[in-house]
């Protein structure tokens, strides 16, 4: 205590006296990973995790994405929600696969990386699936493949379009060949949809790589990407190390892919619901739907 503090009355706080720290609720403020702006959490969530300052598309959870797609007045039903991963191979790297599963389930709150639902989009039936990158990097294992296949089967039974939002690092190495088999399994499921004349729209988000990009993610009747999403089989650093050349600026980003004919269009996440509704009604030759939000 300084001599000045001794002379000051006890009721008076000096400038150097530490004030009580105010606890800020977790998630109240977030920082944009692109422009660095401080963003108010609830407003960012309402804006579908898109920065209002620079329009940068940040990561969004699968359930939030699907909730923004389906009609509010007709709650969707989840498909194959009870399925969970099994460590058939008893795989172990630095950590046991079984332990990784439990850790991911605890941190993400999901059983696996793909959520599939059946619901309504502006009054018309729709089946949609979305990857949750928070679960082991959105990697594709047996459960992801099975949920995708079952979602396609539901779309086939109902006779409605199928939409999938991809965000994945690729096949899950801890499941070995069981994971790689899902590439053929999901592609075959889409083949049955195509034979029935039902549309499949693939939405590629950041990032869509590996076995997912090499299978159902690029098999859409229409392939849509979110702005500046990384899309490709191997990442740019791996390619540069392999070919020993500097890649073009923006290589493997959605804008580059659109310019080179690899995808059909780019759509802002906030406009995605309307865009998908327009495309599905056109492809199904349905009358233009009434906007359920405006009703």
Swiss-Prot record:
It catalyses: N(6)-carboxybiotinyl-L-lysyl-[protein] + acetyl-CoA = N(6)-biotinyl-L-lysyl-[protein] + malonyl-CoA. It is found in: Cytoplasm. Binds 1 zinc ion per subunit. Component of the acetyl coenzyme A carboxylase (ACC) complex. Biotin carboxylase (BC) catalyzes the carboxylation of biotin on its carrier protein (BCCP) and then the CO(2) group is transferred by the transcarboxylase to acetyl-CoA to form malonyl-CoA. Belongs to the AccD/PCCB family. Acetyl-CoA carboxylase is a heterohexamer composed of biotin carboxyl carrier protein (AccB), biotin carboxylase (AccC) and two subunits each of ACCase subunit alpha (AccA) and ACCase subunit beta (AccD). Pathway: Lipid metabolism; malonyl-CoA biosynthesis; malonyl-CoA from acetyl-CoA: step 1/1. Its main location: cytoplasm. Zn(2+) binds at residues 32, 35, 51, 54. The gene is accD. It comes from Xanthomonas campestris pv. campestris (strain B100). It comes from the Bacteria. Keywords: ATP-binding, Cytoplasm, Fatty acid biosynthesis, Fatty acid metabolism, Lipid biosynthesis, Lipid metabolism, Metal-binding, Nucleotide-binding, Transferase, Zinc, Zinc-finger. A zinc finger (C4-type) spans 32-54. Residues 28-295 form the CoA carboxyltransferase N-terminal domain. This is Acetyl-coenzyme A carboxylase carboxyl transferase subunit beta. The lineage of its organism: Bacteria, Pseudomonadati, Pseudomonadota, Gammaproteobacteria, Lysobacterales. It is an enzyme of class 2 (transferase). Residues 1-20 are annotated as: Disordered. Its EC number is 2.1.3.15. Its cofactor is Zn(2+). GO terms for cellular component: acetate CoA-transferase complex. GO terms for molecular function: acetyl-CoA carboxylase activity; ATP binding; carboxyl- or carbamoyltransferase activity; zinc ion binding.
């Amino acid at each position: 205590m300084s001599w000045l503090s001794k002379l000051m009355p006890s009721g008076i706080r000096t400038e150097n006296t530490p004030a009580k720290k105010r606890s800020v609720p977790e998630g109240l403020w977030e920082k944009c990973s692109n422009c660095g702006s401080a963003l108010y959490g609830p407003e960012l969530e309402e804006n579908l995790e898109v920065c209002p300052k620079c329009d940068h598309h940040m990561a969004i959870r699968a359930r939030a994405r699907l909730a923004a797609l389906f009609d509010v007045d007709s709650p969707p039903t989840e498909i194959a929600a009870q399925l969970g991963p099994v460590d058939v191979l008893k795989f172990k790297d630095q950590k046991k696969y079984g332990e990784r599963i439990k850790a991911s389930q605890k941190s993400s709150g999901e059983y696996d990386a793909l959520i599939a639902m059946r619901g309504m989009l502006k009054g018309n039936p729709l089946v949609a699936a979305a990857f949750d990158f928070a679960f082991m990097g959105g990697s594709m294992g047996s459960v992801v493949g099975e949920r995708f296949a079952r979602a396609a089967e539901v779309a086939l039974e109902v006779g409605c379009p199928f939409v999938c939002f991809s965000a994945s690092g690729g096949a899950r190495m801890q499941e070995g060949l069981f994971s790689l088999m899902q590439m053929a399994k999901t592609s075959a499921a889409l083949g049955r949809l195509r034979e029935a004349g039902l549309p499949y729209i693939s939405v590629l988000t950041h990032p869509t790589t590996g076995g997912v990009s090499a299978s159902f993610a690029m098999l859409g009747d229409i392939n849509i990407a979110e702005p500046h999403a990384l899309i490709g089989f191997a990442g740019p650093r791996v390619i540069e190390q392999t070919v020993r050349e500097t890649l073009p600026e923006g290589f493997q980003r959605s804008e580059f892919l659109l310019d080179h004919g690899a995808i059909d269009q780019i759509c802002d996440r906030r406009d995605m619901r309307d865009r998908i509704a327009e495309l599905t009604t056109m492809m199904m030759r349905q009358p233009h739907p009434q906007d359920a939000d405006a009703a």
